[in-house]
């Protein structure tokens, strides 16, 4: 596994675009699957990396192509890696992907993310009414969580004006430490259920219901966000908590070889049960009818053909 930081991204990861592409696809003749492809995922301790590792293992079992899991800040960083040819695949939140639907294609819609806002149980925040003036980490720099959280806070009138919160962008490990040490009052995270890093916290946490932002979000971003629920006991709560859901897309560069795109479709459908992290409670989209719903991002032509071959 390799890690890409904002600094290394801005420096081009030490290679030109052409050299990066040659490295990833080196040793392959035209029409053959590359020996290894790179998938931009997310932060250690999050569900993007979990999914990337499971997909890597599934491709290894299938004997089709190797996959290198790249840790990043999240969706926005992943889009930059695709754009600059420093990754062949990326997992990206649908709202982040929709900010620029060009120069990328989709392999499929894979699972639902839940925008989660964690606070200390018994702390100063019991609900949204306690947010004004509080210190909030909205997610890592260049993460999809930060993008979605800013939209939610804007919809709630908490990003500007007299009720504005104090915003910071912390990586997951930093955010967890800050929450435990009272350096922040709440942290946002967008991911599957449960968030693995929460389970190792010594501090008890609970979720804040953010769904009063949904009507305003629907006006500004129609069809992008849905009402979801975090099941009871996910984080020790006796009751389920309403949440904001947004889809995740597995994206690729348009020049991803056809046979690789087809192999990915085969694994997503044929090995679906092995692509769900152990203990996962969230919504999965690993069926043909759900995988193909990647609007406004077009499916990779070879992936689309493969779905049709398999399911008409």
Language-model features, listed with the residues they occupy:
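Pocket-lining segment of extracytoplasmic ligand-binding domains
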Residues: 94-97, 160-251, 255-256
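Pocket-flanking alpha-helical
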Residues: 52, 68-105, 173-179, 193-201
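Bilobed "Venus flytrap"/periplasmic-binding protein-like clamshell domains
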Residues: 34-62, 113-181, 293, 297-302
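A structural signal for short loop-to-beta-strand junctions that line the ligand-binding cleft
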Residues: 102-110, 136-137, 233-242
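Bacterial signal peptide processing site
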Residues: 29-31
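Segments of small-molecule ligand-sensing domains
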Residues: 241-312
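N-terminal export signals
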Residues: 2, 8-27
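Extracytoplasmic
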Residues: 34, 64, 77, 102, ...
């Amino acid at each position: 596994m390799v890690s890409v930081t904002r600094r290394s991204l801005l420096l081009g990861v030490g290679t030109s675009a052409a050299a990066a592409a040659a490295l990833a696809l080196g040793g392959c003749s035209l029409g053959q699957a590359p020996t290894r492809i790179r998938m931009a995922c997310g932060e250690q301790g999050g569900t993007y990396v979990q999914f990337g590792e499971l997909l890597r293992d599934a491709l290894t079992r299938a004997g089709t192509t190797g996959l290198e899991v790249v840790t990043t800040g999240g969706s926005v960083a992943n889009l930059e890696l695709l754009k600059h040819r420093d990754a062949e695949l990326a997992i990206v939140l649908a709202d982040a992907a929709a900010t620029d639907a060009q120069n990328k294609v989709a392999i499929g819609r894979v699972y639902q993310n839940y925008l989660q806002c964690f606070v200390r149980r018994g702390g100063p925040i019991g609900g949204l009414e306690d947010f004004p003036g509080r210190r909030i980490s909205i997610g890592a720099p260049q993460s999809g969580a930060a993008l979605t959280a800013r939209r939610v806070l804007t919809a709630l009138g908490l990003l500007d004006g007299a009720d504005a919160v104090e915003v910071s962008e912390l990586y997951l490990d930093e955010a967890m430490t800050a929450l435990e040490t009272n350096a922040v009052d709440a942290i946002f995270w967008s991911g599957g259920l449960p968030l693995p890093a929460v389970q190792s916290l010594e501090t008890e946490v609970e979720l804040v219901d953010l769904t009063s932002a949904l009507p305003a979000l629907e006006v500004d971003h129609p069809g992008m966000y849905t009402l979801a629920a975090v099941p009871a006991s996910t984080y020790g709560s006796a009751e389920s908590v309403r949440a904001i859901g947004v889809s995740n897309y597995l994206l690729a560069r348009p020049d991803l070889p056809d046979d690789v795109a087809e192999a990915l479709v085969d694994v997503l459908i044929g090995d679906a049960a092995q692509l769900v992290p152990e203990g996962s409670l969230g919504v999965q989209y690993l069926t043909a009818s759900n995988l193909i719903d990647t609007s406004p991002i077009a499916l990779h032509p070879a992936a689309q053909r493969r779905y049709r071959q398999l399911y008409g």
